[in-house]
């Protein structure tokens, strides 16, 4: 039985880069991993495969949406450390629903019988709007992970995600494994003070703190995971540690997790100092 993870976060905060590096850390610890990109940008698996692969929606269009005509090879690419990647894709701009495409991808995975092939299945999901389709991975996940930065917009989105996880937990097994604080700029005096407060209020923890580092950004544009960058790169070992920490935690016998209790908007403003 696969360990199923659903990674969510506000767009543009490094969610997919973080997901790819978590997948890499899990694979290097011996797990057979499938990463599924659930974002219309369809670039989640780029650091793993080194290319923009064909999406599920593109493959379905080629067979007039007859799921039974597709095989795993039509939609899956293998990349770094033997990680398999799949991209849901999205409809043309101005038409259709991105969430629907995510739901179709989940259906295809079931029909292809892929859930039993992997040790870990990681969904990398757009977290700005958690509608029915984009929340579908929570129906199958053992654990959700929220990627966030230490700012209002990110925390606001994280709170909405906590609402979705709480609601899904009533019918499904999903729990929140924690929040990954991303782009923590220690060099410029940055920290996680607001995220620390938020995590405590909703009843979760900071799973790891990923530093802001140019090497992480460069690895993304190079189409590589951080683990695939040259060992001589300055700061590589420091940057790897949070991802290895996350992988070790998730592969443990009983990772710490909880059902979050979202807070009101006023409390979020109080955390960031906007309202008293």
Swiss-Prot record:
One Pfam family hit: Fer4_NifH
Residues reported in the UniProt entry to bind [4Fe-4S] cluster: 97, 131
Annotated EC: 1.3.7.7
Pathway info: Porphyrin-containing compound metabolism; bacteriochlorophyll biosynthesis (light-independent)
Catalytic activity: chlorophyllide a + oxidized 2[4Fe-4S]-[ferredoxin] + 2 ADP + 2 phosphate = protochlorophyllide a + reduced 2[4Fe-4S]-[ferredoxin] + 2 ATP + 2 H2O
Co-factor requirement: [4Fe-4S] cluster
Subunit structure: Homodimer. Protochlorophyllide reductase is composed of three subunits; BchL, BchN and BchB.
Protein's job: Component of the dark-operative protochlorophyllide reductase (DPOR) that uses Mg-ATP and reduced ferredoxin to reduce ring D of protochlorophyllide (Pchlide) to form chlorophyllide a (Chlide). This reaction is light-independent. The L component serves as a unique electron donor to the NB-component of the complex, and binds Mg-ATP.
Protein name listed in UniProt: Light-independent protochlorophyllide reductase iron-sulfur ATP-binding protein
Species annotation: Chlorobium luteolum (strain DSM 273 / BCRC 81028 / 2530) (Pelodictyon luteolum)
Highest classification ranks of the organism: Bacteria, Pseudomonadati, Chlorobiota, Chlorobiia, Chlorobiales
């Amino acid at each position: 039985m696969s360990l199923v993870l659903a990674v969510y976060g506000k767009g543009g905060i490094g969610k997919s880069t973080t997901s790819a590096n978590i997948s890499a850390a899990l694979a290097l610890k011996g797990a057979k991993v499938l990463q599924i990109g659930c974002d219309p940008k369809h670039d989640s698996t780029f650091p793993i495969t080194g290319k923009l692969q064909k999406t599920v929606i593109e493959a379905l269009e080629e067979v007039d949406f007859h799921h039974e005509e597709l095989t795993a090879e039509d939609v899956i690419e293998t990349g770094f450390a033997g990680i398999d990647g799949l991209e849901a894709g999205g409809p043309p701009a101005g038409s259709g629903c991105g969430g629907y495409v995510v739901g179709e991808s989940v259906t295809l995975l079931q029909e292809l019988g892929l859930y039993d092939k992997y040790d870990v299945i990681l969904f990398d999901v757009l977290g700005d709007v958690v509608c029915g389709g984009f929340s579908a991975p929570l129906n199958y996940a053992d654990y959700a992970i929220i990627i966030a930065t230490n700012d209002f917009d990110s925390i606001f989105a994280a709170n909405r995600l906590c609402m979705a996880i709480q609601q899904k937990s009533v019918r499904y097994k999903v729990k929140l494994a924690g929040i990954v604080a991303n782009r923590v700029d220690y060099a410029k005096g940055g920290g996680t003070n607001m995220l620390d407060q938020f995590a405590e209020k909703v009843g979760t923890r900071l799973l790891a703190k990923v530093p802001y580092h140019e090497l992480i950004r460069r690895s993304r544009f190079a189409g590589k995971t951080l683990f695939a960058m040259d060992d001589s790169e300055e700061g590589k070992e420091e940057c790897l540690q949070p991802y290895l920490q996350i992988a070790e935690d998730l592969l443990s016998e009983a990772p710490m997790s909880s059902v979050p209790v979202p807070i009101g908007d006023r409390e979020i403003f109080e955390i960031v100092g906007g309202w008293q």
